[in-house]
């Protein structure tokens, strides 16, 4: 899967251009399948999660979520959620990370433990997903 929420984890489309991008985004999140909905309710804390996408390959199965998008200047801050299970492992791992979409640049950043924003590795499709995120608040 694509890198999302950390070194050994998967990337969010999640994670979008508020006021700087066209009003129309070229991408929309997938509809959450019932299987992922049940797992999310069991594994991700709290309410308000929006399913973004899921993937599966020989090494990992994962789904990405976001919630609470809030425009802050030329960015959109949000919580990114990840459900992850590595091949051969019976248990799921969930992570919630503070992230932001840098609308003007079409990229994502992750908030480090010291409160500083650091670049988050992008992947194919990140910029279009950033446009969608930035159109939400």
Predicted features and spans:
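Positively charged n-region of N-terminal signal peptides that target proteins for export
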Residues: 1-4
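Bacterial N-terminal signal peptides
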Residues: 8-19
């Amino acid at each position: 899967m694509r890198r999302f929420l950390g070194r050994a984890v998967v990337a969010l489309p999640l994670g979008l251009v508020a006021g700087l991008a066209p009003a129309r985004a070229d991408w929309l999140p997938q509809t959450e399948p019932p299987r992922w909905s049940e797992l999310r309710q069991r594994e991700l804390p709290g309410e308000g999660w929006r399913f973004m996408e899921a993937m599966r390959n020989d090494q990992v199965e994962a789904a990405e979520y976001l919630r609470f998008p809030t425009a802050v200047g030329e960015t959109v801050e949000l919580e990114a959620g990840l459900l992850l299970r590595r091949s051969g492992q019976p248990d799921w791992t969930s992570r919630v990370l503070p992230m932001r979409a840098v609308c003007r640049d079409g990229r994502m950043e992750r908030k480090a433990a010291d409160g500083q924003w650091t670049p988050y590795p992008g992947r194919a499709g990140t910029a279009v997903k950033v446009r969608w995120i930035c159109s939400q608040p």
